């Protein structure tokens, strides 16, 4: 009887671990280190992100590798379906339409259909950061197919690194690696998400 209980608990534990569907705090700030590679180009950048889940919007600003940190910012507002590309120094702004769903952007959350692929620890002993990894696939209306692997902290589902392999309709491949650091729950400066008057006009 004891053995049956142990086996049942082990099965339940495995089922819980293998289930996706978790999200980090609904509002946060973080730096994103981005690497994009395809057959013709390689791009790297370090951006600052402000994520406002309840209002379905987020901001990416600057690129410290090109000395643009703080001078340019893009605000993606999915409730309005508009993105604002803002140059703070030049006081200029352009807009472009947004498509798709907010929750599918930046792969911040682990979706329900994600498959658990293993766990790991960064560091050692009591100072180790324990993490879980998942894998899932997405097909987009434009024909792109994506295989996504993501690693998040065991506690609070905070993203650590996401790797996306994309194949377009013509068969071309690209690799997108997104790493997070200096993660801070909540929004330190909500004014960064305000649309300036010269952009609304």
From Swiss-Prot:
Intervals of motif Microbody targeting signal: 199-201
Domain of life assignment: Eukaryota
Glycoprotein keyword on record: yes
InterPro entries: Ependymin
Tissue-specificity statement: Component of the acid-soluble and acid-insoluble organic matrix of calcified shell layers (at protein level).
Alphabetical keyword list: Glycoprotein, Secreted, Signal
Pfam family, one: Ependymin
Residues in the signal sequence: 1-21
Family under the similarity heading: Belongs to the ependymin family.
Protein's name in the database: Ependymin-related protein 2
Organism: Haliotis asinina (Donkey's ear abalone)
Taxonomic classification: Eukaryota, Metazoa, Spiralia, Lophotrochozoa, Mollusca
